[in-house]
């Protein structure tokens, strides 16, 4: 598993401890009842801290699933995701 994906899995596991590890890669805001606006802010804060990045409000509005967030992180310059 790629390092970025592994680190993102850890962020999700912290924000949503009720999820089994194998559930995380397929989770989205629409599929997880506990992913409300507060949980979303918490998740994005964890991601910003873990990856040392800032996520703009415009970008955050589209980050509605594990897969979309992973794609977003993979598009960052390599040094930003280290």
Locations of regions flagged by a protein language model:
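Phosphopantetheine-dependent thiolation modules in NRPS/PKS and related acyl-activating systems
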Residues: 1-82
């Amino acid at each position: 598993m790629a390092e970025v994906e592994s680190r993102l899995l850890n962020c999700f596991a912290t924000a949503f401890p009720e999820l089994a590890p194998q559930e995380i890669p397929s989770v989205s805001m629409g599929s997880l009842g506990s992913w409300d606006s507060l949980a979303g802010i918490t998740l994005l804060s964890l991601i910003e801290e873990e990856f040392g990045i800032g996520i703009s409000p415009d970008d955050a509005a589209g980050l509605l699933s594990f897969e979309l967030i992973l794609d977003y992180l993979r598009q960052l310059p390599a040094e930003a995701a280290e």
